[in-house]
């Protein structure tokens, strides 16, 4: 494979990880990074794999899904995790790093690898076939390249993500929530409904208007799509706007009263098993502490809500992965192109690095003319892959970026003692299932990072 050169576009965590995994398997890599020729508004440091803050890699505890992902990446010889461990700073069970030293370490390892050639220029067009390329240009992909990518994906490219909160099923008060689809359509248990009377509704709207918002960065001037407005922006347009929009009660009579409430918050099943529920239409720029406070205090049935994910809206270029990408992360309409990182719809630095590793493994399988072998579904890597393929989501799911969470994993079998017992069962199963997949990796040409 040493005579074959693969181009990796983007020197963030996904691109750096992909380049490393390819190079250590003996593939010649051209890593193209636009810095310092051009910087996005989020770039400050000169090197590769730039993080925005020291604790961006989050929890290192394997009882959390992202901590389990850390563990799996270490077992697979991840450059990102190796350099993170080498530049770690004390932060409890979080994997916090010295950002500058981390970026320098990643840059040094890649620039010092004989199989990696780093080129500094901005790419404005997609590489032509037949040579293989990994596109890992991140959430702030330049306009020219984004336009080419939109053409290649049939227009299924989004420029903002609008993420609504997700609540763990077990934390919803079922004595208040009731199952019903609008006008009784569907199976009847596709949605849970939280009824609000007029006083509760107005108190909730007031809390939304007064809640603290995340300030927009200079490159994130709020130009929202009318069909995907933040819930607080809708509230600003009039007291009853939400009651005629995402909280409209029409066709959702409360079985206890036989009448429509003044307003209804709908929760849609987020996974096939119903372990997590999405607050429909609740994309928001409220700060995360405010979301927890307001939704628990003012939404009936969510007083003890455990949030699997909190809402956000920000600039984020990403494709509709389940429809655009093949299972090996190649573009269906342009199979020589593989996507990796946040542009695929994974959220977070660790998830981006993991996606880069998966894309590299897919490229290696393509070069070896063998079928792609996805990570086992019950692993953290496999859960991310299930998200990208849509397997983790119910039919008709509106694809949005996601961190790795246990709700993306296949359901457990048997009985487990509480939430901690279920997490431990997920971890044990993932550890067991990852081992055979590790053994299928091509032998590295050089030692792994770390």
Curated annotation (Swiss-Prot):
GO terms for cellular component: cytosol. FAD binds at residues 10-15. Catalyzes the folate-dependent formation of 5-methyl-uridine at position 54 (M-5-U54) in all tRNAs. HAMAP family: TrmFO (MF_01037). Belongs to the MnmG family. TrmFO subfamily. It is an enzyme of class 2 (transferase). This is Methylenetetrahydrofolate--tRNA-(uracil-5-)-methyltransferase TrmFO. Its EC number is 2.1.1.74. Keywords: Cytoplasm, FAD, Flavoprotein, Methyltransferase, NAD, NADP, Transferase, tRNA processing. It is found in: Cytoplasm. Pfam families: GIDA. SUPFAM superfamilies: FAD/NAD(P)-binding domain. GO terms for molecular function: flavin adenine dinucleotide binding; tRNA (uracil(54)-C5)-methyltransferase activity, 5,10-methylenetetrahydrofolate-dependent. GO terms for biological process: tRNA methylation; tRNA wobble uridine modification. It catalyses: uridine(54) in tRNA + (6R)-5,10-methylene-5,6,7,8-tetrahydrofolate + NADH + H(+) = 5-methyluridine(54) in tRNA + (6S)-5,6,7,8-tetrahydrofolate + NAD(+); uridine(54) in tRNA + (6R)-5,10-methylene-5,6,7,8-tetrahydrofolate + NADPH + H(+) = 5-methyluridine(54) in tRNA + (6S)-5,6,7,8-tetrahydrofolate + NADP(+). The gene is trmFO. Its cofactor is FAD. The lineage of its organism: Bacteria, Pseudomonadati, Myxococcota, Myxococcia, Myxococcales.
